Amino acid sequence: MLCPVLLCATLLLLTPFEVTEARALHPSADAVQFVEQFLDRYNDLLTLDDLENLLNTQPEEQSTLSSGVKTAEYPKWADLQTQPETPWFRLLKGALTNQKRAEPDRSRRGWNRGCFGLKLDRIGSMSGLGC
């Protein structure tokens, strides 16, 4: 019992009491310039929330556009319908629709029932080993 206490005491005595100096990191001008250029170039891309809003409100916007409402009342991303779809936009749009389509299917299935339905093992865990 005395040995761990002595070991801790010696370790505390051996640690330096002075605060060592650390060099502050200053971003270089090249790094700052690169980040600014990167943000300027990719700032106008769609976020996932914008894409979801675009997919969810697309039929509503078509009906309001045909009714003669001014286009200045619409958000910035409403003009994307007139532009040709880029490959990235199609990829993200397809992935989002596939994800939404697959989600209810998974929740509806529930447990894997197998051939003979659910089985309760001896330890109380569920298994679908029926075949």
UniProtKB/Swiss-Prot annotation:
Instruction: List cellular component terms (GO).
Output: extracellular region
Which cysteines form disulfides?
Answer: 115-131
Propeptide-annotated positions?
Answer: 23-109
Indicate the secretion signal residues. 1-22
Tissue expression remark: Brain and spinal cord.
The protein's superkingdom reads Eukaryota
Which compartments does it reside in? Secreted
Matching entries from InterPro entries are given as: C_natriurtcpep, Natr_peptide, Natr_peptide_CS
Kindly give the Pfam families that the UniProt entry links to this protein. Answer: ANP
Q: Which PANTHER family does the protein's record reference? A: C-TYPE NATRIURETIC PEPTIDE, NATRIURETIC PEPTIDE C-LIKE PROTEIN
> Tell me, what does this protein do in biology?
Exhibits natriuretic and vasodepressant activity. Has cGMP-stimulating activity. May help to regulate body fluid homeostasis in a variety of aquatic environments.
**The name this protein goes by in its record:** C-type natriuretic peptide 1
Lineage of origin: Eukaryota, Metazoa, Chordata, Craniata, Vertebrata
